[in-house]
C-alpha cells in the first residue's frame, strides 16, 4: 500500500468513526441498541469492510461500543460512578444525578430469619421480609437489589411497602429510623441466567456483587442486602486518607 493509499484509508476510517459517534450522540443508535452489521455499514458509508472493522474496533476499545459474541455490536450504556457506594437510598441518588428512577419487584415474601439473625442481631425463630427488585436508571436496568428486612423490628413492613416506594423513606416515616451508615463487601460474581435476563447481559458476564449491612442512628442493623450490577455499567471510586 502506497503512502497515498494509507493516508486515504486513514481519512476514511476517521470519517466513519466520527459519523458513528455523531449518530450515537444524536440518538440514531441509543444505549443498549444494536448497530447495523458490518455489511450494512459498508453499504451505508460506501467503504470497505476493513475500514468499518477498524472504526468499530476503535470504538469498542474506547468503551463506546461493546461486542456480544453471537449477537452483534451494541452501544455501550454510560457508566454511573459510585451509585452503589452511596449511603442514601436509590431514589435520593437518582434525584442527585438528575435522572429518573424506577423499580420492578420480581420477588417478595416472608421467610425465616435464621440465615440472617447474626448479622441483624435478631432471634433465629423470627421472620424477615425478602424483597428483590430490579432498579432502573433512565429506563436502563442498573442493578438487582435483594434485601432482607427484620419484621420483628419493623412489623408489617411487607404490608406497608408497595412497588415504587422508597424503603428508606418508609423506615424514616413509619418507624423513625434513619439509615446513616453501612458496611459493604465487594466481589465479582458470574451472572446467572435470571440475572442475565433482568440486567440484559450475557450469561456468566462479570457482575459486581455488593453485600451490605445498613445501620440506623443508634448503630442497630436495619437490613442486609445483596446488589448485583454489571461491571461495565458502573465505576467504583474509593478514596483513602491517612490520618
UniProtKB/Swiss-Prot annotation:
Q: Which domain of life is it from?
A: Bacteria
Keywords (alphabetical) are: DNA-binding, Repressor, Transcription, Transcription regulation
Q: Which InterPro entries match?
A: Bact_HTH_transcr_reg (IPR050679), Chorismate_lyase_/UTRA_dom_sf (IPR028978), Tscrpt_reg_HTH_GntR (IPR000524), UTRA (IPR011663), WH-like_DNA-bd_sf (IPR036388), WH_DNA-bd_sf (IPR036390)
Q: Which GO terms describe its molecular function?
A: DNA binding; DNA-binding transcription factor activity
Q: In which pathway does it act?
A: Carbohydrate metabolism; fructoselysine degradation [regulation]
Known DNA-binding region:
38-57
An annotated GO BP: negative regulation of DNA-templated transcription
- Family matches, as Pfam families: GntR, UTRA
HTH gntR-type domain boundaries? 10-78
Described by its record, this protein's role is as follows: May regulate the transcription of the frlABCDR operon, involved in the utilization of fructoselysine and psicoselysine.
What is the name of the protein in this document? Probable fructoselysine utilization operon transcriptional repressor
Native source species: Escherichia coli O157:H7
Amino acid at each position: 500500500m502506497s503512502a497515498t493509499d494509507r493516508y486515504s484509508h486513514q481519512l476514511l476510517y476517521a470519517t466513519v468513526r466520527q459519523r458513528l459517534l455523531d449518530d450515537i450522540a444524536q440518538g440514531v443508535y441509543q444505549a443498549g441498541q444494536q448497530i447495523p452489521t458490518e455489511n450494512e455499514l459498508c453499504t451505508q458509508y460506501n467503504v470497505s469492510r476493513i475500514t468499518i472493522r477498524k472504526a468499530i474496533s476503535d470504538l469498542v476499545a474506547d468503551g463506546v461500543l461493546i461486542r456480544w459474541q453471537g449477537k452483534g455490536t451494541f452501544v455501550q450504556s454510560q457508566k454511573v460512578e459510585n451509585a452503589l457506594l452511596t449511603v442514601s437510598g436509590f431514589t435520593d441518588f437518582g434525584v442527585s444525578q438528575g435522572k429518573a428512577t424506577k423499580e420492578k419487584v420480581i420477588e417478595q415474601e416472608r421467610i425465616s430469619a435464621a440465615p440472617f439473625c447474626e448479622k441483624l442481631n435478631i432471634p433465629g425463630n423470627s421472620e424477615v421480609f425478602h424483597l428483590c427488585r430490579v432498579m432502573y436508571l433512565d429506563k436502563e436496568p442498573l442493578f438487582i437489589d435483594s434485601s432482607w428486612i427484620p419484621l420483628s423490628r419493623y412489623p408489617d413492613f411487607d404490608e406497608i411497602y408497595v412497588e415504587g416506594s422508597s424503603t428508606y423513606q418508609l423506615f424514616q416515616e413509619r418507624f423513625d429510623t434513619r439509615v446513616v451508615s453501612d458496611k459493604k463487601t465487594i466481589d465479582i460474581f458470574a451472572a446467572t441466567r435470571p440475572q442475565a435476563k433482568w440486567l440484559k447481559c450475557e450469561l456468566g458476564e462479570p457482575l459486581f456483587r455488593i453485600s451490605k449491612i445498613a445501620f440506623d442512628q443508634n448503630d442497630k442493623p436495619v437490613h442486609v442486602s445483596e446488589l448485583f450490577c454489571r461491571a461495565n455499567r458502573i465505576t467504583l471510586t474509593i478514596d483513602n486518607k491517612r490520618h
